[in-house]
Amino acid sequence: MSFILALDQGTTSSRALVFDHDGNVLGLAQKEFRQIFPQPGLVEHDAEEIWASQLGVVVEAIARAGITAADIAAIGITNQRETTVVWDRRTGRPIHHAIVWQDRRTAGECDRLRAKGLEPTFRNRTGLVLDPYFSGTKLAWLLDNVPGARARAEAGELAFGTIDSWLVWNLTGGERHLTDASNASRTLLFNIHDGAWDPELLELLRIPPAILPQVVASSEVYGETAARFLAARIPICGIAGDQQAALFGQLCDRPGMVKNTYGTGCFMLMQTGERPVLSGRNLLTTVACRLGNRTEYALEGSVFVAGAAVQWLRDGLGIIRTSAEVETLAASVPDNGGVYLVPAFAGLGAPHWDPYARGALLGITRGTTAGHIARATLESIAFQTADLLEAMEADAATPLAELRVDGGATANNMLMQFQADLLGVPVVRPRVRETTALGAAYLAGLAVGYWRDRAEIGRLWQAEHTFEPAMDRDRAAELRSTWSRALERSQGWAQP
């Protein structure tokens, strides 16, 4: 019997999961790594620490599954997107810490590009907005601020990649420098219509083409692991950015199907088929996956801070000891007591796109308790999701039938019920909640014939629980109206 290994490299931890043919998790390992905050608004990772943590959990997950590396049929990779790494091709060493997707250091550069009237150019070609969130301006910053980097890049000595590229480079012992189309579509450098790096956008951001990875399909055999890592050469066969992998793992394979992932951030994607739909409401158009010559697209809304707000309660305020305690604390009060948290710790993402927004806690009175703050924190995740869905339904001109959910915070029943109440549609939690890793596993397995086709994996999806809306629609509208007032007060707070 053989198995599929999925590498799930996230914003706060590296994970590895072993799946069997029925999509069951046989072994799982996870390791957190450092979050580096050099200044307010700046977020970095040590890329070498990411690699070490990822390799460590791979070995641990295989051991926990009770198998050997020789039993692995294929490896799939899913990753935090946009996070930018540049390394020396000869030594394999990064020239700087990785700049994380949450980092806002290039807000001024985005403003300058916008002032030149270039927003429509980037928007129409990439499906993205000009925002520090994406990789392009991060890469330009590294080339401009690391001594000698630009000259070395132009000489072909440096390699750029998102985290998937960094992992593949290391897994193959430096033999392969590549990224899949879903990750490439998050860089501000990739033309989603042509399916290739865009020469004009590269010129606008002063990016030498020699630094870029090869763009490949999301499901194909890219190469094999170097034998020194796992005592076996295992095919690396599937890659997708974390949110696209979750869309695939949730079997949202028909236009109009929507999933929302509740992780560090919160990310909603709607499958739109083979036609890229450009949003009129500040959503993103992105590549969902590339299978052979077929490219599928999605509309996306990205919330920067979701589960990270709960981590702030734990690490910043110290009102909970573990993230799981937030549900009990929030349940200690009957409602939010008029308290609203806008967790704009790294600005606001879709549909607002305000890099200068900052976090705000509003409605506090002498009677406000830790329970009210905990409840407001959970509710902020649902409010941001509701803003996304409203914009998405308008762009697609199609009302949502159900919302499929995944990610760590979906274990929080209070949050899921409030989400259904606020949206007025069923919220469906799948039996296998590890849908991001599962999507990467499916992509890898399809490449080597472990699963025959999407119809076969489609039969594996099952709902574990459906949360039906129970709140009066007038009450939901009232709550959302107050949320909007709070949102307005957080916007434009930081100085450009």
From Swiss-Prot:
Top EC class, one word: transferase
Catalysed transformations (reactions): glycerol + ATP = sn-glycerol 3-phosphate + ADP + H(+)
Chain positions recorded as glycerol binding sites: 81-82, 133, 242-243
Entry-linked InterPro entries: ATPase_NBD, Carb_kinase_FGGY, Carb_kinase_FGGY_CS, FGGY_C, FGGY_N, Glycerol_kin
Cross-referenced SUPFAM superfamilies: Actin-like ATPase domain
Entry's EC annotation: 2.7.1.30
Pfam families the UniProt entry points to: FGGY_C, FGGY_N
UniProt-listed CDD domains: FGGY_EcGK_like
Domain of life: Bacteria
GO cellular component: cytosol
GO molecular-function term, one example from the UniProt record: glycerol kinase activity
Gene Ontology process terms (BP): glycerol catabolic process; glycerol metabolic process; glycerol-3-phosphate metabolic process
Regulation: Inhibited by fructose 1,6-bisphosphate (FBP).
Positions annotated to bind sn-glycerol 3-phosphate: 11, 81-82, 133, 242
Transmembrane segments: none
Keyword Kinase set for record: yes
Keywords for the protein's UniProt record, in alphabetical order: ATP-binding, Glycerol metabolism, Kinase, Nucleotide-binding, Transferase
Binding positions for ADP per the UniProt entry: 11, 15, 264, 307, 408, 412
Function text: Key enzyme in the regulation of glycerol uptake and metabolism. Catalyzes the phosphorylation of glycerol to yield sn-glycerol 3-phosphate.
NCBIfam families xref list: glycerol_kin (TIGR01311), PRK00047.1 (NF000756)
UniProt name for this protein: Glycerol kinase
